[in-house]
A protein has these predicted regions:
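Bacterial signal peptide processing site
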Residues: 26-29
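Periplasmic-binding protein-like
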Residues: 58-59, 63, 161-182
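C-terminal motif of bacterial Sec signal peptides marking the signal peptidase cleavage site
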Residues: 20-24
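Short, polar/charged alpha-helical segment
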Residues: 60-67, 75-81, 209-235, 239-240, ...
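Short helix-initiation/N-cap motifs at beta->coil->alpha
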Residues: 74-102, 232-243
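Short, well-ordered beta-strand elements
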Residues: 42-47, 198-210, 228-234
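A bilobed periplasmic-binding-protein/Venus flytrap-type ligand-binding module shared by bacterial periplasmic
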Residues: 138-156, 282-295
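Ligand-binding "clamshell"
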Residues: 106, 119-131, 263-275, 290
Length: 298
């Protein structure tokens, strides 16, 4: 009797040891109701701009559409480290904004600024899978070096960019991909400016090729009617257009939104100020390997 009891106890102990060993090695109880799908869900790679304000803007777009959740209080300086919920197993891939269209074949999706999307042959309205509203916080601005806000050249350029001609061009040319935010367009001229004194002079401005340099061509015609030359210098990056304003090489620039400018000034010690909000370019989510949002809805 005692021998049989001992045998049964030994068998029971062996069973418990085996069960504990399986658990320690990662064995799962198949009867558990809590099967974590995220362990087996495929990674979804989404490219975003790597500069502070545009990365935050991209992440906010993803959050607004239920793809991720950011920590409370994460706003226009949010980074991927602020992601607190990631139900679709998204991997955020940071890259220079201008390179994201070229990276689409290697990514599932990318969040791209409209100017770079348009330059790559994408239509922000018809080709994007998700798109921002016309958020005024990200309006693209005309800027000058601090102290030059009321110079005749700055005021003449400001009036030309805030003209009805420019607003109409934006509406007709971009069909919603770029939206004018000028509330009361002018006739292109500022009554306080002595245009006769500016005759024969040149205003230099740095801009990105699309759409900024294109829009400036309309302003160029307005200024030319007063015998003022607008010299448009195109740049493909986010740094040089600000440095050439700050060092006085050019009179103004037109390529960025205010949150980016504020961050740039803080990081680089520059003194560049906005004198006009001209248009907004809604940021969009574009498909790469994925052509629908199905990978983000499972």
């Amino acid at each position: 009797m005692k021998r049989n009891t001992f045998t049964r106890l030994a068998a029971l102990a062996l069973t418990l040891i085996l069960a504990l060993s399986l658990t320690a090695c990662g064995g799962k109880d198949n009867t558990s109701a809590d099967n974590n799908d995220s362990d087996t869900k495929a990674t979804v790679k989404i490219g975003v701009p790597n500069d502070t304000t545009n990365e935050a803007r991209a992440l906010l777009l993803l959050q607004e559409n239920g793809i991720i959740k950011l920590a409370d209080g994460a706003g226009i300086t949010a980074t991927k480290n602020d992601i607190v919920e990631n139900p679709h197993n998204v991997e955020i891939v940071e890259a220079e904004a201008a390179q994201l269209p070229n990276m689409l074949p290697d990514l599932d999706y990318a969040v791209i600024n409209s100017n770079y999307a348009i330059n790559a042959g994408l239509n922000p309205v018809s080709d994007s899978l998700l798109i921002e509203g016309s958020a005024s916080a990200y309006a693209n601005i005309l800027t000058v070096k601090e102290g030059n806000e009321t110079s005749p050249k700055a005021l003449a350029l400001k009036a030309a960019l805030e003209s009805k001609q420019v607003a109409d061009y934006i509406s007709q040319q971009y069909n919603g991909s770029v939206v004018s935010v000028v509330e009361n367009p002018t006739d292109g001229y500022d009554a306080s400016v002595d245009y006769d004194a500016l005759k024969g002079q040149t205003i230099t401005i740095a801009a990105s090729p699309t759409p900024h340099a294109e829009i400036l061509e309309v302003a160029k015609e307005i200024l030319a009617a007063k015998d003022i030359t607008l010299d448009i210098q195109s740049y493909n990056d986010y740094v040089v257009p600000n440095t050439v304003v700050d060092d006085g090489t050019v009179d103004a620039n037109y390529f960025q939104h205010l949150p980016y400018l504020e961050d740039f000034n803080a990081q680089n010690g520059t003194h560049i100020v906005s004198i006009s909000a001209v248009h907004v370019e809604p940021m969009g989510l574009y498909g790469g390997k994925q052509t629908t949002l199905d990978a983000l809805s499972k």
